[in-house]
Structures are given as C-alpha cells and as structure tokens.
Amino acid sequence: MLKNPFNNNSLINKYQSLINQINTLEDELKTLTDSELRATSFKLKKQYAESKNLESLIPKSFALTREASLRTLGLRHFDVQLIGGLVLNDKKIAEMKTGEGKTLVATLPAYLNALTEKGVHIVTVNDYLANRDQVSMGQIYRFLGLNTGLIQDGMPNFDRRENYKADITYVTNYEVTFDFLRDNMALNLKDVVLRPFNYCIIDEVDSILIDEAQTPLIISNNIQTPIEKYIVAAEITDYLELNTHYKVDEKNKNVILTEDGSKQIEQILSVQDLYDPRDPWIPYIINALKANALYFNNVHYIVQNNRIIIVDEFTGRIMADRRWGDGLHQAIEAKEKLPIRQKTETVAAITYQNFFLLYPKLSGMTGTGKTAETEFEKIYNLSVEQIPTERPTQRKDLPDLIYKDQFSKWNAVAQNCNQIAKIGQPILVGTTTVEKSEMLAQLLSEYKLSYQILNAKPENVRRESEIVAQAGKKGSITIATNMAGRGTDIILGGNINFKIQKKLYDILTLVKNFKRSKKENIFSSSLLSQFEGSSQKFLSVLVSLSNDQKFLKLSDLDILKILRENDCISIPITSYQCSIRYLIDELITYNKKHQEQENQIVKNLGGLYIIGTERNDSRRVDNQLRGRCGRQGDPGTSRFFLSLDDNLLRLFGGSKIQNFMQTQIPDDSPLESEFITKSLDSAQERVEERAYQQRKNLFDYDDVLNKQRNIVYHERRNILESISVQKNIFAYGEQIITELLIELKEDKSCNIEATNLIENLFGRNLVLNYIKTSSLSISNLDLSELKIYLFNEFWLTYQSKITELSIYGEGIIENLERSIILINTDRIWREHLQKMTLLREAVGWRGYGQRNPLYEYKQDAFYMFETREELLRHLVIYDLLRSSIL
C-alpha cells in the first residue's frame, strides 16, 4: 500500500488499484531484454490502433516507461510520481513540490498518449528547459521506439515541420503559439508546420495560463508613426506637476489629467482642444505621463543596445520580442531619449487562454497551483490535485519580520545575510526588481560578503543555470529576481553536473589548445597538476583526444555547447563524443563521494536559507520562492522581510495600515503584529481576486473574437488544403447576385442600368444577350428571370477568365484562385481586428448609459463579422475577374 505523507487519502484511494497493477507488472518487465521491452512497446501501439482505447493500456505503458527510465537514466519513478502521471493523463493539473521530479513524471502520460501517433506537445517556459528535457527524457522515448522533436528559436520551417511530426515534441509556449498564428497566414500548404493538436502537457502551467494570460501573442506590421508627437509629449511632462496637473492611479496603472493640466498643455502646444479628433494630442500626453510616473528603468524594463527591453514581472527575465502597445512603448523610448520605433498594426493575435483551449486534451504541472484552482476550473476546466511528496517536508517557514520603512528593512536583510554567512549556510535572496537586487548587492559589499546576482541584465542572464545550480553550496549568497520558471534545481552542496561541466570544459580546452601550440608533451610536469588523482585510463583518453583531428577542430564554444546540451551523453556518435562520455562518467564517480560529503555538511547547517524581501501580488510567487528550499525532504528555512511602505501594503493595505504607519515605531526593530500579517494576507487575496476578475473579463471579451477567429481559420485551412476552390468561387458569385436581388426586391425605386449593375458586380463589361437595350431599367425586369440571366453571365464570365489564363500553364488557375481568396481573407481579417479593437474601447463608455458593455460588444461584433464575409465575397470575385498574370 502506498504511504501517505501528505494525508491525501482521496487521491491515493482513487489511483491505488492502478498503482498496484503497475507495480505488479514491474517484476515481469525486469526479466525482459532491451529488445523485448521495445517489442512490447510496439505491441501496445498496435493494440491502440485496433481498439482505440488508451485506458486499458495505462498499467503496462506506465510500467514500461518506469523500466525504460531505470535502464536509460538510472531513475525509477516513485509511486507518488506514478500518481502525478495518472493525474496528468486525466486532464488535470498536478501540483508537485520543487525537486519532486515533474520532468520525469511527464514521461508517463507523454509515452501513453504518443501511442496514438497523433503527437504530444510538452510545453516549457524557455528554450533552455525545452532542450534540456528533450535531451534527457528523450532517451526514455527512444529506448521504447518513439522519436522526439525539439523546437527552438530561429529554427527554419522545414526543421520545425519535421520536429512537430515527432511522437513527442518539446517546445516553448511562445514558439508553438506563434507557429499556430504563422500557419494560419500561410499561402502555401508546404509552409504549414503544425499538425492537428492532440495532447499537451504544460510545465509551469500557472505561469503560462495565469500570469501571462492577459498578454496576447501578436504578429504585426509597421505603420506610419508621428514620432515628433512622442518627443514633444515627453518634453511637456517636465512642465507638469503631480496632483496639480495630473493624478496617478497606481492600482490601475493609469494617469488622469486634471482641468488645470489640460489648460496648461493646450497653452504650451498653442492648441484649442487636446481631444480634437482631427489632430488628437491626448493619447500622446497620457502615455508620456504613464512612462514617467508608472514605468521605471531597471524595474519594468532595461535599456540595452539603444532599445527598451521589457522585464517580466513574474520571472525577472527579459522579453526581447515583446513591446507595450497603444503607443506606450514609443512614449518610454521618448522618455529615455532613444530612437523611436514605428508603431504596429495587428495582423494576427491570440491569447494563451484561447490558444491552449484548442488542444482536445490538456494538462499541466506546477509547484504552486492550488491557490489559483478556481481560475483553472472556470476558464480552462482544469482541476488541481496536490501530489504527495516522496519524503516528509522539513522546511521551516519563519514568521514575517515587518519594519517601518524600506531603509530599515534592507539594512535588516543585509545584517541577516552577514549573520547567516558566518556559519556558512547558503542563502538565496529573492527580490522583485533589477534595481532592488543591485541595491542589496551594494549593501552586502559593505559587509565584504561575496555573492552572485541573477537578474535581467544580459551579463547575469548568460550564467543563469550555473548561478542557480551552485546556490546550494556552502557559504554561497545568491541574489535573484523572481524565481519562477528557473528550471535548474538548487541542490545542497552544489550541483555535481555543473561542477563536472566546468572542470571538464577547462580540461578539454586545455588539451585542445595545448596540442595546437606543439611546444611540449601534454603531460609534462607543468600540466600534470591539472589531472592529479586521475586514473591511467582517464589520462589515456585525454591523450587520444589530443590526437583526434575532429576534436581538435572544435572551437571552445563547440565544446561548451556539447557539455551544456549533453549531446555526447545521449547519443555518442563520433569517437570524441564517446571519449567525452567516458570522461563525464569518470568524473561523476570520482566526485560523487565528495559531493555527498558537501551535501551532508550543508544539511547539518540547516539547508538553504531563503529570504524574501517583499510580498508579491500573488501568493503563488511567494510560494515559488519558498519552495526553492526543502526539496526532497531536505532541511531549509524561509523568512520574509517586509516594510509598511512595500507596494502591497501601501496600495492595498487599507486605511488602518496607513494609520499604523504614522505611529512611533523604532526604525531598526521589527514588528510582530497579527493584525499586519492578516492585513497582508487579505491584501494579497484582494489583489489576486482583482487580477482574476480582469483576466476573466478579458476572456469573456476575447471569447467573442476567438469564435470568429476559429471560423476564419477553419475556412482558411479548408481553402489552403483544397485542390480546387472552384465551388467557392461559384458560391461567392451566386451569393453576391442573390443578395443584390433581395435588395432590389425590397427597394422598388431602384433605377440602375443593367450594364452598370453587371460591371459593378463583376468588375468588367459583359456581352448582354438577355438585355437588348443598355438603357433598360432593372425595375422593368422580372427578378427571377434576371437571377437566371446573371447566374449564366457570371458562369460565362468566369469560364472566359479561365480560358484566358489557361495558356500560362497547368495549375496556374487553381493557385491564382486560392491565393486571391487567402490574401483577401487575411486583408479583411486584419482590418476586422483593428475594428474590433476600436469597438472594445468604445463599448466601455456605453456602461455609463446603463447598457451592458459585453452584450453591446457581442451584438456589434456579430454585425461586423457578417459584413466581413460579404466584403470577402465581393473582393474575391472582383479581383479574380479583373486578374492578369502579367
């Protein structure tokens, strides 16, 4: 019976029968050879092909995956990890604590669902994690006869398509979403890279589906931008005073111009009305004020290579490809006196909320999902299950220490670091911004303490994995902006893999570069110290590498890449890769005992000591930081240092907190107040509820556009995949004629000449057999006869165009027709997106008239979509009948 350290009886009882079946199969599979295991895997795939029933395959597929993992990686899935895999397969979110092996757990449902041959996507938050997991976990899948794919930034279309064809593909949320948008802009089927969606497992699911839910993924084109207005608006802000000319709403990230402010600006600009629709200044002024009052360098963005780079508030990482919309990004560029880049218009867009709902089967993993369970259930229909830990948690979460102001708090943090550092206990300090991480670094320098800093600055980002991996070493101090999505585990005593990587990199580059110098023997006395304690075989392998011409041609960067990506570990191909594989194994064996000693020393010191320097808006982010210590039953401690003027309390703490701040409290003494602790918890809950309502509101509005998008993309894909679109052309033309005749029937006063009517309809003059007199009025004709006549004339005109174009070669006509429909579909959709954006802004004002903005939005959006379809028909027929190859 499975032990229950988490007291989650209902979950264990639900899956106990399956766990027992999997464990029973384990002994049977252990007796099989590698080839017999692979043959069993092929039998499972055949069973599914015949029965189309995955449920019956769960026990054997999970047992197979467990055995394959043990044979390839030396890692055996614990029973609690089997539960995690079963939860994921049931289309749920598995909440697993840090270090409990989420990456390994995902292999269980991934292998099972890959048996359908419909593809599985494992989505991670960055390229590094996607590459790392594909290389390591891919060994399990390949052992069982499956292939894996990997999508990385900058990969060409051909490679993307091939990797998406794999049984299991590792990809970032960013890449797969943009591939979806690009696929739905393709003019040729060979440019489409994705196949139909099947099953998706999202790692750090709360980061993607909640924290980034409000950020749409956009493909855009540059449009003309009044750069001088941004520059002038930025200069005007120097002449405006806070609370006199404008007010700042920090909660809603907005600024409000006062009447005095409007007059002051109108006087400076010598204009009568800032809101004049013919020459509006107000959006530029508001954005300039926002840029000055609400967005700060080294907090919300950094300046790099004369560009504004956004910093993700949840992960602390830079988002080089993201830009703020509605002119805000240009306003910040003007504020920082940087070159102002062009504004853009949206060509295609989708939110993560709607994108991931396209998967028929969706699940996710996170260390912190339970606090957001309501949102997961209501928007994504995903429940959250807390997976028991393999070992009881030993982490101690100490009470918050609350200081009067920022100055006192940061001094206390530095003093605490100094005290803990004296005993050698490793420390990880979490900060919320680049600016604060660098300020703390200066304070620690005054204590002459050594530290590593990890924030959005490029020089620090490059060393992210190494910094995080070594944060558990004795005596280390690591300062990091938010820890979400930093996939490397913090191992007490340091991460042996990174130690070996660094040592082996030094050895290999020394061997390669020394050989090139040709001055002396590689193992002369001056270099012998580099290999002290190594075995004779280890030294022999180094000698063979020093004579391997392929190895000697590698650059230092090539060697680093091989070691980082572990290419040589997974599938050694060349002789030098086999040699490096041996060296790694040898160094692991040699260093393992020392690593175990270091690990025990740090455990005896109390494990990793976590310091939080501010409560975040979300409890999940705080828990992500705390969760960095106490992994796999290790000891650890966490404590938050707070001040009464932290943003959370200042903006959302309420009037009682404001009054509390006025009392006489010693600057250097922390407060222990149950009232303040409850106020903090209450403030976080209010902010979370507020954020949830904003995301829910966005989802409700975006759902309208999403339904329209699905229709357009479905119709577009049908056109793209059609051998011939002649039926569509006929349908468009006949629908145009039918709509016109309905209009004529309703409007008896119409007096249009037949020749003009046809020319307007089809973009050309026709030979009129039915109507002998060009001056004959439509009103004098029988509409049913006219309908037959116009249908015939349209068909004749179409056939005439086909004959005209057929001389240019086979397939030309089909490609032209398809391209005309696709190009006009994209053009009208692009214009529709702009109109929908304007409509979204406009309906908000209707609420002041006691009208429901969402209802108004739906009604107007429906009408706009109907007119879009009508316009498409007219443009396609007009362009086709007027088209010419030359």
Swiss-Prot record:
Protein localization: Plastid, Chloroplast stroma; Plastid, Chloroplast thylakoid membrane
Catalytic activity as recorded in UniProt: ATP + H2O + cellular proteinSide 1 = ADP + phosphate + cellular proteinSide 2
Residues annotated as binding ATP: Q81, G99, E100, G101, K102, T103, D489
Residue spans crossing the bilayer: none
Superkingdom classification of source: Eukaryota
Topology in membrane: Peripheral membrane protein
Gene Ontology MF terms: ATP binding; protein-exporting ATPase activity
Lipoprotein is among the record's keywords: no
The EC number(s) this enzyme carries: 7.4.2.8
Family: Belongs to the SecA family.
Protein name: Protein translocase subunit SecA
